[in-house]
C-alpha cells in the first residue's frame, strides 16, 4: 500500500486502508459493473446509484443489488465478500430510451424470494414500479409528466408502508404517492393544507382519491435528497438553497433547520439512534447537526471537492459504560480491548436513548460515519463524546440559542433563548425552532395530517389538527411559539404576511443556523483515501463490508477487518 507522500503517491488509487479496528481491503472478485466491465463514459450522465435488499432466501444468499449506469439498470445476486461476482448472469437488465434512471429504492417490507417491489425515478420526472424477479412492469407514475417535468432526485418507500412512497424532484417539490391509486389524465389541482417558513404542503383537489396525495414545496431550487429518521417519524431534506430542513412527517411540522457554510447541500443521513444528522454539500464539508438541540455541533473538513454521499456505519458505532479506556499499543491489542464491553448497532440505540441529562455515569460514545465526494476520496470520521458532551462548549452564547424569526420573540430580550448556567450540555430546545405556521387548524383534534391525507382525501382536512402539541414539554416553550397552531382559516391574511418573512441566507453566517468555523469543533477524518478514477456516488455500510461506487459504473466491495476469507468462484 502506497504511503501518503509525494504527488505521485497522493494520486495513486488505494486498495486498502487501516483504521483502529484493523485493515479494510478492496476485493476485486466482488466488483460489480456492466457485464463487459468497460468503464462507462460518464460525461453528462446521472449519478450511479446502488440499492440493496435481502429476500430472506432459504439458501442464505438472499442479498440482491440494483444499480443504474447511464440508460441501463441492472439487478444482480450480491455475493458479498465470500464469492466472486458473476456479471454474465444478471437477474434483470433494462435499457431505457429517451430518459435515464436517476435513483431507486426497494420495499424491504414486502420483499420475498419470489417477488420484490422496486421503485425507479427518471431524469424526465417519471417513476416506475417494477418487479425485477418476475420481470414485469407494474405501474408508471407521472407518465405524461403532468405532475412534475423535472428530474427525480430521490425516491423512497415510506417506512412501514407497503403502498406509500415519496418522490423528490429538482423542481424543489416532493410528492406522496400510493401505488394503489392512479395519477389522472389531467394536471392535478391543489389546495393549501399547511404553510410555513420556506415550505408549503398541498393536497390534490379531486372528487376521487388520486395521486399525488400530497405535494410538498420545500425551499428554493432543487430538493437534492431526503432521508427518514430510523423510527420513520421525521423527514430530513437538503436543498440547493443550502438548507437542511427537518419535518415531523405525520403532522407536517417543521422541527428545525440548518444552513450550509456555502452553496447547496447534496446529501443527508441520520445516526442509528436518530439523535444526529450529517449533511454534505458544495462547501466541501460534512456538518453534524443535533436533532435534540437543533444546532450544529461539529463540522468536518477532509474533502477537496463537493461531498456527494454521507452515511453512518451502524456496525462500528458504539457506546461503552464506565470510564473511557486509555490505550497505547498495537492495532491487534486495541482490537481485543474494543470487543470488551462494546455494544453494536441494536443496543447502541437503546443505551443511548436511555441516558438523560441527569445521568452522571461516565460514558464513552463513538459514532462512525463516512463520506465520499467528487474528489474521488473516501473519508471516515469518528464523532466522539468530547464533541457530543463538551465540558466547555465553544461560544456558549451562540450554541445555546434558538433560531426564531422576528414574528416570534423568545424569552430573552436579545432574541436568544436563556442559557442555563452550569450545564455542560445545552438544554433541549423547543421541538420546533421555526414557526410551524398552519393554513387551517382545529386545536381540539389530535388527528395526524398524513393519516388524514391518506384515509380521507381532501374534504375533511379543514377539521384536522395541523399542530399537535403532544411534544410540548414546557409552558414557556408553548408561549414562545405564540400558539401559531391555533390560527384559524380566518387569519389567512396575517398568515400570509408572516410566511413572507423568510430567512435571508446571506445573513445566517454567525447565527445558530450557520455558526462560524471557529465557533464549532472541526473534525479531522480518521482516513481520507483516493479510491477511484471518477467521482464517487455511493457509500453503503454493510455488516461485513463497505460498498462504494464511482461514476464509471464500478461497484466496489471493501472487506472489513477479519471478514476477508478465501472465496469460492
From Swiss-Prot:
One of its GO terms (molecular function) is deubiquitinase activator activity. Residues 450-468 are annotated as: Mediates XPO1-dependent nuclear export of WDR20-USP12 complexes. Changing residue 466 to A: Induces partial relocation of WDR20 from the cytoplasm to the nucleus. It is found in: Cytoplasm; Nucleus. Its main location: cytoplasm. One of its GO terms (cellular component) is nucleoplasm. InterPro entries: WD40/YVTN_repeat-like_dom_sf, WD40_repeat_dom_sf, WD40_rpt, WD_repeat_creC_regulators. Transmembrane segments: none annotated. Residues 405-423, 431-445 have a biased composition (Polar residues). The modification N-acetylalanine is found at residue 2. WD repeats lie at residues 94-138, 139-210, 211-252, 253-331, 332-426, 427-523, 524-559. Residues 405-445 are annotated as: Disordered. Changing residue 464 to A: Induces partial relocation of WDR20 from the cytoplasm to the nucleus. The modification Phosphoserine is found at residues 357, 360, 432, 434, 465. It comes from the Eukaryota. Pfam families: WD40. Keywords: Acetylation, Cytoplasm, Nucleus, Phosphoprotein, Repeat, WD repeat. Interacts with USP12; promotes translocation of USP12/WDR20 to the plasma membrane. Component of the USP12/WDR20/WDR48 deubiquitinating complex. Interacts with USP46; contributes to the cytoplasmic localization of the USP46/WDR20 complex. Component of the USP12/DMWD/WDR48 deubiquitinating complex. Regulator of deubiquitinating complexes. Activates deubiquitinating activity of complexes containing USP12. Anchors at the base of the ubiquitin-contacting loop of USP12 and remotely modulates the catalytic center of the enzyme. Regulates shuttling of the USP12 deubiquitinase complex between the plasma membrane, cytoplasm and nucleus. PANTHER family: WD REPEAT PROTEIN, WD REPEAT-CONTAINING PROTEIN 20. This is WD repeat-containing protein 20. It comes from Homo sapiens (Human).
